[in-house]
């Protein structure tokens, strides 16, 4: 017994485990227990888990089963803990080593070494343990040099595992960067291709986005007025005078309180009290006069009366807009008079007659860039010329052929005499000097002589004519029969020596060099233009009468329309195909206006049918004279912007946001403009 006690005392072991991380890793691994033997509970549950998960099979002498093993460890909170376990509770894989065989170790006495290879097959435990031991290897070796933490094979696996983790981390980072770059590129492409012409029409400031109750009281008070008038009419018909007077007084009070308010915020503080008072009056009227059938009749009469008023206001608005659009502003009229007076007073008319042949060679040189502008508006024409020259790379190669009427010829000549752009060549002609342009040759002039056409146009502003043909007011404008408007169909006759010419309207602004237009291969077509059709809009059936068999049998109703305003004409192909003859043929057929209304675009669509080359839309952006929601980027990137419509930039009707594109080419410091009070 003494021998056994001595031996037990001699072999009593104190195992110090540095478990700051190793213990935690084993705890978290939750690896399956293999061949565990029952052992008594330890003082701390965490230590129990350490031994239960790590002690796979202990090898020891059966006589030493009562030897105590004391272990220290750190729990999850960093506190140092002690635990005891009997040798008999450990697995057989635990071995006793004699320190005499450990040459590299200097400590004396027996040591207990945990053979980690005994649980290498446990994958989860291996991963977690290796992660913890890797971070704490140096520290453990310094504090506990007697503990063999891992075999060389285990260390190699740990190193390989760390390398794989590093490679995987780098791969994930690379994939994340690639994904971010792809998302950014997709977002950029989406933003570049995003069309916001429609979205631009919406704003959070629009009434659509106001609170639905923002004008609840205002609407209530207006509805009360309608109800009160209906009951008042019934009261009057039934000789209930007191109630009639009371209701009309309340109507007047409601109108006074409403005033010019457009929302509840504009109403005075007494509005709600007045609405309550009117509600009380309507309640009294309902109790005394309510008759469903009678009320329905009154409301129907009010509705019909209101509809008639709305129709009348629409007609009036249409007429006034058309009137304003075709009216020549007083400042522009002043400008023409001042220029014409100075032209003749200073004798420039005689001097020009002597010098008119000086630049004849340039005017007929087909290698230069020739423009045709037909207008009676001096200021508008000057903007077209200035914007073209200022944006041209070679202004000396640009030649402008301007044709105006007899009334504005002197003013146009005077303006370009004193304000001629540098280098460019300007020719101003009078349409009345074209003797070949007469009624025997020109269909439009011949039609103008008919009494029916004169009646249709020159009495268009008569009240009876307005009420009868309000829908056609746009076309009932004598300017549509002006020869300046139809001279575009006679370009080969006006310029017989030229091969190509660019036609420009006087309501356009040039923003880029137009010289590349002469290099476009039009593939044998006569007219180069930008198409205007979008979905079902601006197609042939919008302009032509397809109920007429002459139209329906020769043209496609769904054919895409295009725009006048900036058109490249191949005059050689024009002469070859006798385009002017085609125009005359269809113009004669439309003498009674059954094929199309009027204007120059419908006969243009017919004349150049299947002979029009579609140019890129960026060359010509239209709609600045009628559409307030155009794409701003498209406008700024366009070579030419066109103010087609009633809201011309020189009129007070113009859209303020579009006017700067035009006004920046106006010389507002010019003495003539200042004299006529033409300013921004």
From Swiss-Prot:
Membrane topology value: Single-pass type II membrane protein
GO CC annotation terms, alphabetical: endosome; Golgi apparatus; Golgi medial cisterna; Golgi membrane; plant-type vacuole; trans-Golgi network
Listed transmembrane segments: 7-27
Family annotation (InterPro entries): GAUT, Glyco_trans_8, Nucleotide-diphossugar_trans
Tissue/organ expression: Expressed in roots, inflorescences, siliques, leaves and stems.
Gene3D superfamilies: Spore Coat Polysaccharide Biosynthesis Protein SpsA, Chain A (3.90.550.10)
Phenotype when the gene is knocked out: No changes in the cell wall content.
A Pfam short name: Glyco_transf_8
Biological processes per GO annotation: cell wall organization; pectin biosynthetic process
EC number per UniProt: 2.4.1.-
Region annotated Disordered, chain positions: 118-146
Record topological domains on the Cytoplasmic side: 1-6
Pathway involvement of the protein, from the record: Glycan metabolism; pectin biosynthesis
Glycan attachment sites: 121, 128, 135, 239, 386, 438, 545, 578, 610, 631
Annotated SUPFAM superfamilies: Nucleotide-diphospho-sugar transferases
Family recorded in the similarity comment: Belongs to the glycosyltransferase 8 family.
Record protein name field: Probable galacturonosyltransferase 3
Species the sequence originates in: Arabidopsis thaliana (Mouse-ear cress)
Lineage: Eukaryota, Viridiplantae, Streptophyta, Embryophyta, Tracheophyta
Name of the gene this protein is made from: GAUT3
């Amino acid at each position: 017994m003494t021998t056994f006690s001595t031996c037990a005392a001699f072999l009593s072991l104190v195992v110090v485990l540095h478990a700051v991380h190793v213990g935690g890793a084993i705890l978290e691994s939750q690896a399956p227990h293999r061949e565990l033997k029952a052992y008594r509970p330890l003082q701390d549950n965490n230590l129990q888990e350490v031994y239960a998960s790590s002690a796979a099979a202990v090898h020891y002498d059966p006589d030493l089963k009562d030897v105590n093993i004391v272990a220290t460890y750190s729990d999850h909170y960093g506190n140092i803990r002690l635990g005891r376990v009997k040798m008999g509770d450990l697995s057989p894989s635990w071995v006793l080593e004699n320190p005499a065989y450990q040459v590299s170790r200097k400590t004396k006495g027996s040591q207990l070494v945990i053979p980690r290879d005994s649980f290498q097959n446990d994958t989860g435990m291996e991963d977690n343990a290796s992660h913890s031991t890797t971070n704490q290897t140096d520290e453990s070796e310094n504090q506990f040099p007697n503990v063999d933490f891992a075999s060389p094979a285990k260390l190699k696996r740990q190193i390989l595992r760390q390398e794989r983790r590093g490679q995987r981390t780098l791969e994930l980072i690379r994939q994340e960067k690639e994904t971010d770059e792809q998302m950014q590129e997709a977002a950029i492409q989406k933003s570049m291709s995003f069309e916001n012409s429609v979205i631009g029409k919406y704003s959070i400031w629009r009434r659509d986005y106001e609170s639905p109750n923002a004008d609840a009281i205002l609407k209530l008070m207006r509805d009360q007025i309608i109800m009160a008038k209906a009951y008042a009419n019934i009261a009057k018909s039934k000789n209930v005078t007191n109630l009639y007077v009371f209701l009309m007084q309340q109507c007047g009070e409601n109108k006074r309180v409403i005033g010019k308010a457009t929302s509840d915020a504009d109403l005075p503080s007494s509005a709600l009290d007045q609405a309550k008072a009117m509600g009380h009056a309507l309640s009294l009227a309902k109790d005394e006069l309510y008759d469903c059938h009678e009320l329905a009749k009154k409301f129907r009469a009010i509705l019909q009366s209101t509809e008639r008023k709305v129709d009348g206001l629409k007609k009036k608005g249409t007429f006034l807009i058309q009137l304003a659009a075709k009216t020549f502003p007083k400042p522009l009229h002043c400008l023409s008079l001042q220029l014409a007076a100075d032209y003749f007073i200073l004798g420039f008319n005689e001097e020009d007659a002597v010098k008119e042949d000086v630049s004849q060679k340039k005017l007929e040189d087909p290698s230069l860039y020739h423009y045709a502008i037909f207008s009676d508006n001096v200021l508008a024409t000057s903007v077209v010329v200035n914007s073209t020259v200022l944006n041209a790379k070679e202004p000396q190669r640009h030649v402008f052929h301007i044709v105006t009427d007899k009334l504005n010829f002197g003013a146009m000549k005077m303006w370009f005499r004193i304000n001629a752009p540098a280098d460019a060549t300007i020719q101003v002609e009078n349409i009345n000097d074209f003797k070949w342009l007469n009624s025997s040759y020109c269909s439009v002039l011949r039609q103008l002589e008919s009494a029916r056409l004169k009646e249709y146009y020159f009495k268009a502003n008569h009240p009876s004519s307005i009420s009868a043909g309000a829908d056609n007011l746009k076309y009932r404008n004598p300017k549509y029969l002006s020869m300046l408007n139809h001279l575009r169909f006679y370009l080969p006759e006006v310029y017989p020596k030229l091969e190509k010419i660019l036609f420009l309207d006087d309501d356009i602004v040039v923003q880029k060099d137009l010289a590349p237009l002469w290099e476009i291969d039009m593939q044998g077509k006569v007219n180069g233009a930008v198409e205007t059709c979008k979905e079902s809009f601006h197609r042939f059936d919008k302009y032509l009468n397809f109920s007429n068999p002459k139209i329906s049998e020769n043209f496609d109703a769904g054919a895409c329309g295009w725009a006048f305003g900036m058109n490249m004409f191949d005059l050689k192909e024009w002469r070859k195909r006798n385009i002017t003859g085609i125009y005359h043929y269809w113009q004669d057929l439309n003498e009674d206006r059954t094929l199309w209304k009027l204007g120059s675009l419908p006969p243009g669509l017919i004349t150049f049918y299947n002979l029009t080359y579609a140019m890129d839309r960026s060359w010509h952006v239209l709609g600045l004279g009628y559409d307030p929601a155009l794409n701003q980027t498209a406008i700024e990137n366009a070579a030419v912007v066109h103010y087609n419509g009633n809201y011309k930039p020189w009129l007070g009707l113009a859209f303020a946001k579009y006017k700067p594109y035009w006004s920046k080419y106006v010389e507002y410091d010019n003495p003539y403009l200042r004299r006529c009070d033409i300013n921004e």
